[in-house]
Amino acid sequence: MQVDFTIIRRGNRPLKAFVATLGFSRASYVRFFDHERNDAWLTGLREACHFFGGAPQEVLFDNASTIIRERDAYGEGDHRWHPALLALAEEFGFRPRVCRPYRAQTKGKVERFNGYLKRSFVTPLAATLKQAGLALDVSTANAHIGPWLQDIANQRSHGTTGEVPAIRLQQELPHFLPLPQALPVSPGTTATARPMPLESLQHPLSVYQDLLEVNV
């Protein structure tokens, strides 16, 4: 599994997305935050594993200081990780890995999904909200991301594999590690934002280009 934080909006109302993409199926999970501190990484990782139905054998990170404290601290390839991440890795059983410095492209699967997320979900949702005089924030984004993931993103024919991620996920699941007992709250289950039809997110993107400061 490849994980990343992608910036949706900077400034005094930041919006960021934790994104996890599986290697074989390309199934993805998203959780929005207004920061990317260590607790956000841990929450995203927990929820991603429960969303997919199991824990992957390995999780690939970038070189964020909230994840890795010192590269090669104990020898080549033997890094000093954030202790909270190590505790989570032990709880779920996965092995953390980190990209080589200045080689973030090794997380290409999740990076490509980041662009798709912004084009297909963030920008159209922000436009629909703006028409109603509302702004896209963390709680609203999390209220709508669940249905989009389940009904659109993970049900589309993937551009690389040519197959549906949700279907390929069933082939990937037998290789996952079993989940711990405790269940977290998934995005949208406690949100109070009004429901929005999924078809409202499917307009031509040219309508929305100037609505968000999006780093694609």
Where are these regions (language model features)?
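Mobile-element integrase/transposase regions
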Residues: M1-S28, E36-G44
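Short acidic, glycine/serine/threonine-rich loops at helix termini
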Residues: P14, E70-Y74, G108-R112, E163-A166, ...
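Active-site beta-loop-alpha junctions of metal-dependent nucleic acid enzymes
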Residues: V30-E58, D78
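Acidic/histidine-rich, metal-coordinating catalytic segments
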Residues: G54-G77
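RNase H-like two-metal-ion nuclease catalytic core shared by retroviral integrases
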Residues: F61-D62, G75-E76, F94-R119, L136-D137, ...
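Two-metal-ion acidic nuclease core segments, chiefly of the RNase H-like superfamily
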Residues: G77-P96
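Active-site-proximal acidic segments at structured loop/helix or strand boundaries
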Residues: N114-V216
